[in-house]
Design a protein with these regions (language model features):
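Preference for long, amphipathic alpha-helical scaffolds in soluble/luminal domains
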Residues: 1-256
Length: 256
């Protein structure tokens, strides 16, 4: 779908440009690409070190923003160096400490868990969702892209979360269903994870006549379902594809 080979050229040092140059322009093995990727990754690690101190200090508001930053920098590492180095594993372990759902504030609106994560979701492949599960979904995704999905910790947390969400799909907001799928569909054989099939089929029930999903950005929905070969996912992709193409910018981006 990319219409212009200069995709993201207006952000030459962004992780998206680095990723695009490496994947679509075949520059991943060149010294210049490697230098740019390592330079950006070094900045990510410095930002991770900074937020680790904030997380140690506590404080709900600061922690929420820090967790979003931690997830974002892990995503940027995935776009650039994509290596399970000691520092990347340390960052994953830090995020893992916050995957247990946080207590719901007493002031949460009746019938709502409360939007616990008010931090900036810009540049994150997730949707702001009510409830305490964002760190878990972000960790599932990040750990998977760094090759940890075959380990007992990942499999145990994915299964436990799938068992929680499966019987609740019909009453779970679309953003939370999407975030769960973002953390699991990236893994080969994800259909075997409890809740995955139910969540995909629930999104199909909510998809409107134009292919859009209320509560989920269309490019996020399209991208995550493209990782699945489930019949329901394929039908949803077919339904929205025409409109996804129509929404694309001249340079091939979608509003980034």
């Amino acid at each position: 779908m990319v219409k212009d080979p200069r995709f993201y050229e207006w952000r030459p040092d962004s992780p998206y440009r680095i990723y695009a140059d490496g994947k679509w322009k075949g520059e991943r093995q060149t010294p210049d690409w490697r230098r740019k990727a390592l330079d950006f990754a070094e900045g990510s690690f410095k930002r991770i070190d900074a937020v680790s101190g904030i997380l140690e200090q506590g404080g709900e508001g600061n922690m929420q923003e820090a967790l979003c930053t931690l997830a974002r920098e892990l995503f940027f590492l995935h776009l650039t160096v994509r290596e399970s180095s000691g520092r990347a594993v340390k960052a994953l372990n830090l995020l893992s400490r916050y995957t247990a759902p946080a207590p719901v504030p007493a002031a949460a609106p009746e019938g709502k868990e409360g939007t616990l994560f008010q931090g900036s979701f810009r540049d994150l492949p997730f949707e702001p969702a009510e409830g305490p599960y964002f760190p878990l979904h972000a960790w599932l995704f990040s750990a998977a892209v760094f090759g940890k999905h075959k380990e007992k910790e990942w499999q145990g947390k994915a299964e436990e979360e799938g068992q929680r969400i499966s019987p609740r799909c019909g009453s779970t907001e679309a953003a939370e269903l999407y975030n769960f799928l973002r953390g699991t569909l990236i893994v080969e054989g994800s259909a075997a994870i409890p809740g995955v099939i139910s969540a995909v089929e629930e999104l199909e029930r909510r998809q409107d006549e134009n292919g859009f999903w209320p509560g989920i950005s269309p490019w996020h929905g399209y991208n995550v379902l493209a990782h699945s070969d489930l019949a329901s996912a394929v039908r949803q992709l077919d339904k929205i594809e025409k409109n996804i193409i129509a929404m694309q910018n001249r340079d091939g981006s979608w509003g980034i």
